[in-house]
Each structure stands twice: as C-alpha cells, then as structure tokens.
UniProtKB/Swiss-Prot annotation:
PANTHER family: 30S RIBOSOMAL PROTEIN S20, SMALL RIBOSOMAL SUBUNIT PROTEIN BS20C
Keyword terms, alphabetized: Chloroplast, Plastid, Ribonucleoprotein, Ribosomal protein, RNA-binding, rRNA-binding
Source species taxonomy: Eukaryota, Rhodophyta, Bangiophyceae, Bangiales, Bangiaceae
Gene name of the encoded protein: rps20
One Pfam family here: Ribosomal_S20p
Name used for this protein in its record: Small ribosomal subunit protein bS20c
C-alpha cells in the first residue's frame, strides 16, 4: 500500500474513474446488444424503433468518448460497425 499522500489520492482517484468508466462501457454494451436484436427483427413497421435505438447507442458512445471512457477511434469503430450492420440488414430486407 502506498504511504505517500499523493499516491494514496491517485489510488482513490483511479479506482473512482475505473468504476465510472466501467459503467459507461456496460451501458454501451447493453444498448448495442438491444440495438442488434432490433436490427435482427427488422421489419418495415419497426424501422423507426431501430433508428431510435441506433441514435441512443450513438449518443451513449459519444458521451463515453467525451468523458474519456473510450478512445475516439474506439467510439468511431463501434458506431461504424453498427451502421454497417444496419445498412446490410436494410439491404437484405429490400
């Protein structure tokens, strides 16, 4: 265990940040899974629901990037993959 006061503070701070980052990552994973389930069950009637869920995932990813839980490239990659899956599902439906 650290004896230096600044080191003790850094341990507390890093633990707090770890928990916050974990929360952001968990929310993004959960919303992404929900969105992928909506995309799998894509029909003309629930196209708006799918687009709404995608926008919610995008919003949470952007917030996670802003707070530092995700690197900007990681967020961009997650959004691009989601968009590619959605576009492919739309193409298969038509």
């Amino acid at each position: 265990m650290a004896k230096n006061l600044s080191a003790i503070k850094r341990i507390k701070t890093s633990e707090r940040n770890r928990l916050i980052n974990r929360k952001y990552k968990s929310v993004v994973k959960t919303l992404t899974k929900r969105c992928l389930m909506n995309i799998e069950n894509l029909e003309n009637s629930n196209l708006n629901d799918v687009q709404l869920s995608i926008s919610q995932v995008y919003s949470k990813i952007d917030k996670a990037i802003k707070k530092g839980a995700f690197h900007p490239n990681t967020g961009a990659r997650k959004k691009a993959r989601l968009a590619r899956i959605f576009a492919y599902a739309q193409k298969q439906q038509n």
